[in-house]
Amino acid sequence: MPVYRNPCISAIFVKLMPYGNGPGVKYPDRIGSNMPLATRLTCRKGTSMSEKSGPQSIPAATVVVFRRAANGGPAQVLMLERASTMRFAGGAAVFPGGRIDPSDHELAMQLSHGFDNDEAAARIAALRETIEEAGLVLGMNVRVTPDQAAEARGMLAGHGALAPVLERFGWVPDLSTLHPWSRWCPDWKGAFDTCFYLADLGTGAVEVSKDDTENTHLFWASAREAIAMSERGEISVIFPTLRNLERLALHDSFAEARDFAARFPIRTVVPFRSEVDGEDYLTLPNDLGYPVTSQSFKTIRRG
């Protein structure tokens, strides 16, 4: 279980608390001056989701998919448990997502979307990975049937690119249906520089299924429910996922989360090391809307 620096904050009741940081954590820099300058410049440039990744990082995209809860409670989000054999975050519960491929950039140059090509490629990757990992087609111009979604998933397994799928079904993606949430880039070589997006399914009356290769289980839960599952040891959650679940738990609906995110210009989150009472913590800047901003290295799962 994380060690929360503000003793008033509970992961389950985080909605009741203002976001911010507890006492005792010192910030040497807005992002962290204890990391090499070159790394800070690589991962911290600008405030856009479309800023280019540094040469040592791997561009990636992920999407938090919302649906309304049948019981009228807080909205649920789609999570998947990665196969234990996966090199990154094996066995962990994560949001759908993955690397931004060259084919995503190629498609971005072909579509009319109103974004710069890097931003469009990230959004295309988020849509593609959600089909691959969950069999869920988001953001298209027409209603997609379960049979079409299954065929699209099969095509991606064979081709690996979204363009042939769009051509096969006559789909046109609306990239504006994805809303920026955050961007994370840890400060080590080969880290994923990940753009996080939000998407809304409304009632969520769709079929999703595991792919039996990269993931072994899919489930819907509110952010607060997912945090509780982690605290009970029912799921394993890595540091970035947990921090974003806590931020999502501040909100009962997709609209609330979307509007909240719009208050914070996208600035790359680079966790940094801090020391509190002789103990090392992994820490976030305290001005990005995260209600819990530090966790002891002793309790962190990093991926």
Show where each model-derived region lies.
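N-terminal leader/linker segments that precede catalytic domains of diphosphate-processing enzymes
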Residues: 21, 26, 36-303
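Low-acidity, Ser/Thr- and Arg-rich intrinsically disordered low-complexity segments
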Residues: 2-10, 18, 30-33, 40
